[in-house]
């Protein structure tokens, strides 16, 4: 099997790690996609576990514009929660579903380059695509790479990368289709109703109105960047929704479609 244009990059958030049924459903979806010959990459966050570990160590969680502020002294705890506990929880769920996986992080095999994103955010990284060879090899075996959003700078320091942005960069690296999965069915309007499609102008308007904010703002901006880069829609959907998971297996559109500029 060689790498094809069927690479599907799925991103999941930390809330999934607190839901065994959700993890089982996601991995069953991945298994069915792999059995169809699709190639799947899973990128994950783990904010809930990070918050728990920081609290247990007497440290507080601070966010700026939806991004986690990461002081250097918190980095060992964050790296352990994401590249360690979160990653292995997902590998365990993959094993239960009969999926062969490989636990990885953005540090591995030169897949990305990473620099400090903004001094105000501390050890938060901004990544760019670099070398796809390792991922292409893993995908060609029919395995599922499960990738945490911990990266490494040129001088070896660990950096915390927003998982939506990490998934976006890997979709660019592989020329793949990106689906951002969270615990909500997509982007919702002010009345809590799913918005089926959004372009950049509509996103700007909803941000100004405060309908899209914080973590969803980061997610939608990452999705829009990839949509523009690849010239195809990026989907924002839910791992909680069994109907959306079934549609994903069939290759149907799910959730909110973030559209590229025409």
From Swiss-Prot:
Protein EC: 2.7.2.8
Gene name per UniProt: argB
Major enzyme class: transferase
Protein name: Acetylglutamate kinase
BP-aspect Gene Ontology terms: arginine biosynthetic process via ornithine; L-arginine biosynthetic process
Gene Ontology annotations for the cellular component aspect, listed alphabetically: cytoplasm
Reaction(s) this enzyme catalyzes, per UniProt: N-acetyl-L-glutamate + ATP = N-acetyl-L-glutamyl 5-phosphate + ADP
Pathway the protein takes part in: Amino-acid biosynthesis; L-arginine biosynthesis; N(2)-acetyl-L-ornithine from L-glutamate: step 2/4
Compartments, as annotated in UniProt: Cytoplasm
GO molecular function, one term: ATP binding
Keyword Amino-acid biosynthesis: yes
Main location: cytoplasm
Keyword Transferase: yes
Gene3D superfamilies xrefs: Acetylglutamate kinase-like
Site for Transition state stabilizer, residues: 11, 219
SUPFAM superfamilies documented for this protein: Carbamate kinase-like (SSF53633)
């Amino acid at each position: 099997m060689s790498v094809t244009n069927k690479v599907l990059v799925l991103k999941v958030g930390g809330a999934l790690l607190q839901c065994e049924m959700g993890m089982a459903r996601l991995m069953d979806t991945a298994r069915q996609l792999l059995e169809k010959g699709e190639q799947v990459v899973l990128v994950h966050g783990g904010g809930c576990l990070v918050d728990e570990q920081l609290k247990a160590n007497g440290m507080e969680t601070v966010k700026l514009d939806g991004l986690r502020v990461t002081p250097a002294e918190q980095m060992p705890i964050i790296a352990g929660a994401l590249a360690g506990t979160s990653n292995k929880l997902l590998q365990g769920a993959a094993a239960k579903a009969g999926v062969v996986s490989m636990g990885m992080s953005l540090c591995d095999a030169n897949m990305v380059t990473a620099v400090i994103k903004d001094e105000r955010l501390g050890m938060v990284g901004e990544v760019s695509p670099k070398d796809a060879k390792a991922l292409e090899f893993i995908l060609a075996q029919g395995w599922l790479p499960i990738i945490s959003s911990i990266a490494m700078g040129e001088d070896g320091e660990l950096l915390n990368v927003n998982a939506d942005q990490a998934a976006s960069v890997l979709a660019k690296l592989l020329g793949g289709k990106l689906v951002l999965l969270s615990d909500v069915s997509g982007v919702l309007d002010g009345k809590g109703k799913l918005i089926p499609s959004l372009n950049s102008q509509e996103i700007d308007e909803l941000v100004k109105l405060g309908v899209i904010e914080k973590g969803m703002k980061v997610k939608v901006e990452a999705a829009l960047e990839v949509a523009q880069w690849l010239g195809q829609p990026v989907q924002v959907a839910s791992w909680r929704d069994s109907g959306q998971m079934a549609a994903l297996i069939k290759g149907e559109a799910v959730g909110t479609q973030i559209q590229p500029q025409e």
